């Protein structure tokens, strides 16, 4: 399968799809800062200085004027319409053919098992519950996109192999498995964090060591970086270790990776160059990006053969982080990954992952909507035990009844952008019908509450 990988999106979709179609990709994955703004009232849900807020391209995919020509999946970053994404904590369609992976999730796409987690790490909020709600105050606007231990623990309980792991943040220590000298020449202000072993997320470091996916894709730090992690050299302490044989100048050693494309495509002017400063050790880099001109795409292609199943002694993770959509930046790659199961021709078939559904059922009693995580989270071994019990329910009620297919049930909640909606209007809180349907499907909610009706499109012409 030809997988297009995009770094930070920042609301630029039209030109991205032009590029992805030219590259004939089967699937597009985006590493966050997607900015699914439906109308200008969603500005109140995004953490960003007002002068950099712009509606972007997404609203025309939400209102139906445009449709994504390629199946697109993404995780959330630290610049998102958090009020919209919060309607879909388990994931769901934000527009036709554009799928958000939720706070954390695993799905199967065309035979590839893809896991993902949204947000960035903050020690201050990591152990908190999900207490945020509209209208957001300044603190909530930050904390809502911070990764929680609940989601990391849920993912750590996975035991089946992962093909692709998608995150916004980098796993801490990953730079030691690539060309760290080159990274520091390009981003010298990372040096102190590298020396402190503080570049990236310690929570994602734990996930990388625990899950050992074939590929890990990320964004956030606005630079291209590749690395290869040999897990046989890792200590069993949840941390990345590094030996001299791990560090290479090339990271990915695939042919064609460093061959730039000669294509030129127009790109919208980028108005979201600066980070809203919050003390997070990685967000300050966004201040550096100010150049605006015609885009020269630096698309690379990685070709790889189908890899055999690896034993725990020789597992390898190939890491790829990409830049954001700006001229002369390496923000897009095409990676060819052969699925374990070859899908039928046509659009990749999407399914819920049975193991992940078991995890959701096992972890449901521990969901917290208060600032303190209440009830306390169980140990990883307890979660795995609970998951094994829930696997029986999932197998009997979903797998054997062929109910794992992800429905194409996108539904507008907030009204699409129009002149009647102004920037000073606070967004409303909505119960998304997709979330209700999903909770009913996996047995977290009884079918007793009617889903809210779809929002009528104000631009629709009634004959």
From Swiss-Prot:
| Any one GO CC term of the record | spliceosomal complex
Entry note: cofactor: Binds 2 divalent metal cations.
Any GO MF annotation of the entry: metal ion binding
Q: How is its activity regulated?
A: Active in presence of diverse metals including Fe(2+), Zn(2+) and Mn(2+). Binds two metal cations in two adjacent alpha and beta metal-binding pockets.
Ranges of Polar residues composition bias in the record:
256-267
Q: Where is this region: Disordered?
A: 250-324
Keyword line: Cytoplasm, Hydrolase, Iron, Manganese, Metal-binding, mRNA processing, Nucleus, Zinc
- What Gene3D superfamilies does the database record attribute to this sequence? 3.60.21.10
Q: Where does a divalent metal cation 2 bind?
A: 33, 78, 168, 220
Q: Where is the signal peptide?
A: none
Q: Which residues form a coiled coil?
A: none
Is the keyword Manganese in the record? yes
Q: InterPro entries in the record, alphabetically?
A: Calcineurin-like_PHP_ApaH (IPR004843), DBR1_C (IPR007708), Dbr1_N (IPR041816), Metallo-depent_PP-like (IPR029052)
Q: Could you state one GO biological process linked to this protein?
A: mRNA cis splicing, via spliceosome
Q: Indicate where this protein resides in the cell.
A: Nucleus; Cytoplasm
Question: Which residues hold a divalent metal cation 1?
Answer: 8, 10, 222
Q: What does this protein do?
A: Cleaves the 2'-5' phosphodiester linkage at the branch point of lariat intron pre-mRNAs after splicing and converts them into linear molecules that are subsequently degraded, thereby facilitating ribonucleotide turnover.
The name of this protein is Lariat debranching enzyme
| Native organism | Schizosaccharomyces pombe (strain 972 / ATCC 24843) (Fission yeast)
What is the taxonomic lineage of the source species?
Eukaryota, Fungi, Dikarya, Ascomycota, Taphrinomycotina
């Amino acid at each position: 399968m030809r997988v297009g990988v995009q770094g930070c999106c920042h609301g630029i979709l039209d030109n991205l799809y032009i590029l992805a179609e030219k590259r004939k990709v089967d699937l597009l994955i985006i590493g966050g800062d997607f900015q699914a703004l439906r109308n200008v009232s969603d500005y109140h849900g995004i953490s960003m200085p007002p002068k950099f807020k712009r509606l972007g391209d997404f609203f025309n995919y939400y209102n139906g004027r445009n449709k994504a020509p390629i199946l697109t999946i993404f995780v959330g970053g630290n610049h998102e319409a958090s009020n919209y994404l919060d309607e879909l904590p388990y994931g769901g369609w934000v527009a036709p053919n554009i799928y958000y992976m939720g706070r954390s999730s695993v799905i199967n796409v065309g035979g590839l098992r893809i896991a993902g987690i949204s947000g960035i790490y903050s020690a201050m909020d990591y152990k908190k519950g999900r207490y945020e709600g509209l209208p957001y105050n300044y603190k909530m606007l930050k904390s809502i996109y911070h990764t929680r231990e609940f989601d990391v623990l849920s993912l750590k309980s996975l035991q089946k192999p992962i093909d692709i792991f998608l995150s916004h943040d980098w796993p801490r220590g990953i730079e030691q498995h690539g060309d760290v000298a080159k990274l520091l020449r390009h981003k010298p202000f990372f040096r102190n964090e590298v020396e402190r072993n503080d570049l990236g997320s310690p929570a994602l470091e734990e996930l990388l060591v625990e899950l050992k996916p074939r590929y890990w894709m990320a964004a956030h730090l606005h630079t291209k970086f590749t690395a290869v992690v040999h897990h046989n050299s890792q200590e069993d302490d949840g941390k990345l270790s590094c030996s001299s044989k791990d560090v290479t100048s090339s990271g990915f050693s695939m042919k064609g990776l460093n061959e730039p494309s000669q294509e030129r495509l127009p790109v919208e002017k980028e108005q979201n160059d600066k980070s809203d400063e919050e003390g997070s050790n990685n967000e300050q880099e966004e201040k550096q990006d100010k150049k605006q001109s015609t885009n020269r795409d630096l698309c690379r292609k990685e070709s790889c053969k189908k890899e055999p199943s690896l034993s725990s002694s020789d597992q390898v993770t190939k890491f790829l982080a990409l830049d954001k959509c700006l001229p002369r930046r390496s923000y897009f790659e095409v990676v060819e990954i052969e699925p374990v199961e070859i899908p039928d021709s046509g659009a990749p078939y999407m399914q819920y992952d049975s193991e992940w559904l078991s995890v959701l059922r096992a972890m449901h009693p521990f969901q917290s909507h208060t600032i303190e995580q209440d009830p306390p989270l169980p140990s990883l071994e307890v979660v795995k035990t609970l998951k094994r019990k829930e696997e029986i329910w999932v197998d009997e009620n979903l797998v054997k009844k062929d109910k794992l297919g992800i429905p194409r049930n996108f539904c507008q909640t907030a009204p699409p952008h129009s002149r009647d909606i102004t920037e000073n209007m606070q967004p409303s809180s909505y119960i998304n019908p997709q979330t209700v349907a999903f909770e009913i499907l996996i047995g977290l909610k009884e079918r007793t509450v009617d889903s809210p009706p779809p929002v009528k499109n104000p631009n629709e012409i009634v004959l």
